[in-house]
Amino acid sequence: MTITPQNLIALLPLLIVGLTVVVVMLSIAWRRNHFLNATLSVIGLNAALVSLWFVGQAGAMDVTPLMRVDGFAMLYTGLVLLASLATCTFAYPWLEDYNDNKDEFYLLVLIAALGGILLANANHLASLFLGIELISLPLFGLVGYAFRQKRSLEASIKYTILSAAASSFLLFGMALVYAQSGDLSFVALGKNLGDGMLNEPLLLAGFGLMIVGLGFKLSLVPFHLWTPDVYQGAPAPVSTFLATASKIAIFGVVMRLFLYAPVGDSEAIRVVLAIIAFASIIFGNLMALSQTNIKRLLGYSSISHLGYLLVALIALQTGEMSMEAVGVYLVGYLFSSLGAFGVVSLMSSPYRGPDADSLFSYRGLFWHRPILAAVMTVMMLSLAGIPMTLGFIGKFYVLAVGVQAHLWWLVGAVVVGSAIGLYYYLRVAVSLYLHAPEQPGRDAPSNWQYSAGGIVVLISALLVLVLGVWPQPLISIVRLAMPLM
């Protein structure tokens, strides 16, 4: 196989982030400097983001049998890079008072971002597995980064063991699919799985095992048990990455698999996915009702959001509107989650032991940090799907797609789940405006809005509001990615 200059241009984001990993690694070996290594990481991620323009000029192409670069890959690569950039930005003030080694944090985030980019471009079950492992392995270290805290260490061990088990299910499922189809490429699977072949027991077992592995990575019920504990135990910036980049990259590659291989044509698989979606929506929202820890609440909330997205995935065979719905919903979910976890990161910075994740820590926040409280309110309203926010546009799309595909009981689950979600999101928002306790526990720095993390949070809030009122630019970008699939 010959690598041409066009191929190299198409792989620019992957190459730039890979080069940044090497540069940061050498920088750490030469001299430890927190500011220098954080700056190098942010420059590398920004350069990768800018390089997407050049990738767009090169056009869609299969760079290798494992990777396809097109509009779809560019959209999801951009979302992963934005989430990674926000994670590094939130991590810098959090790590300022951290007594152990700080620099490896950025190295692990960059390697995980590399895995996310690989997933966005994956066109083969081998690259899907490599990407998932490349994004998961650094997260084992990141989740347990505050290892002197028992909760963080426990979360890391739990995530490592369960993730390894999920990967084994995924790999075994791929082996069964290969045994039946004779190929691992998404396109070849689409060609080979015709004429009722999807009803073969071996193939159904293979895809069933893959659903178990991918369901764990996406925190879908009943493979979700790790989610609230890991979100709570992980440092706030790591929870940001887990909730955004990791989920978006994996859901993106699942979308591509369903587009090329007619997995959704099997009635048995559709029923299983519908049950998982229904359970994720209802259970995720019900469990969030009783939470008094914001990170656990957002963890259960992410389970329900992935359930909503699964509704659009099940309806994928009905038309292009499903792809549009997933793209718009994921962008809304990205900015809403970045804003919510960003506020938690700002409240928890610099590192002083456990994060400010108790709901009591946010009581009366409006009276001494009004702008920060307003930002958190906007994020809660967007996650709840209130009109005039980007979250509403995404949820409306999902409902429209469900109605179009006649998935009536899933549409009912989305409506009921949204109603339940409204209660606990508003509970967080209302607590921000109650009378502040006489001795508040934790507080954000007085100049938080001038920090890089503060700027990211403010921009996220602005985008959630502006795109909620005028979503056409976002819809146009998502549509641009679709014909190139």
Curated annotation (Swiss-Prot):
The chain crosses the membrane at residues 8-28, 35-55, 71-91, 105-125, 127-147, 159-179, 203-223, 235-255, 271-291, 297-317, 326-346, 373-393, 408-430, 455-475. It is found in: Cell inner membrane. Its EC number is 7.1.1.-. It comes from the Bacteria. It is a multi-pass membrane protein. GO terms for biological process: ATP synthesis coupled electron transport. It catalyses: a quinone + NADH + 5 H(+)(in) = a quinol + NAD(+) + 4 H(+)(out). The keyword ATP-binding does not apply. Belongs to the complex I subunit 2 family. This is NADH-quinone oxidoreductase subunit N. It comes from Escherichia coli O6:K15:H31 (strain 536 / UPEC).
